[in-house]
Amino acid sequence: KSKTSLQMFQCLSISFKGRGELKSLSQWEIADQPRRILGDDLILAMYANELILRLLPENDEYSQTFSSYWTFLSSLNDLDSNEKEFALRNFENQMLEDLGYGLDFGFDINSEPINEDLHYEFNEHQGFSINSNGTVQGKTLLNLSKHETITNKIELSFLKKMNRKRLKSLLGDKPLKSKELFFVK
C-alpha cells in the first residue's frame, strides 16, 4: 500500500480487477506532478469533471477528450481569464465532438463555406446560417475551424451560449451542481 496521498486533479495510472460492474482498485500510480487549483479555477475544473461524469459513458475510451481535459487543467495556473474560458470551451467542443455532436465551423447549414465577412446565426439542430443580424462573425467561425485561440469577450460570450445550447439537450433538465458554486462566492 502506498502512503502517498492522492491529490485532486492529479493524473493517475490505475488498474481494476473483478467481475461485473463492481470492481476493486488493484493498483495505482501517480502519473504527473500535483497541481494546486484554487478559487475560480477550482470551480472551472469541477465543472469539467461534472461534464465528464454526466456525459461520457463508463468504460469507454475518449482519448481526445482526455487530452483536451488534461490540457485545460494543466494550463489553468498559466492563463488569463479569457484564455481559461477559451480552453474550457475547447474542452467542451472536443467532448461534444467525441460524443458525435461536433460542429464543422468551416461550413454553413447549406454546406457552403463560411464567409469571414458575413454574420451567422447558430441553431443547435442545424448549425450556422447566414443572418445579417447574426450573433457571430464568419471570421470567428473560421478561426474556430483552424483551432485558433479566441480571447475576444464578445466571441467568448457567443461560444459560451452556443455550447450551453449544445450541452443542454444532452444534460437534460437536471442542473449541474458545479454551476451553483459560481453563485455562492
Per-region residue spans from a language model:
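Non-catalytic alpha-helical scaffolds and adjoining flexible linkers that form interface surfaces
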Residues: K1-K185
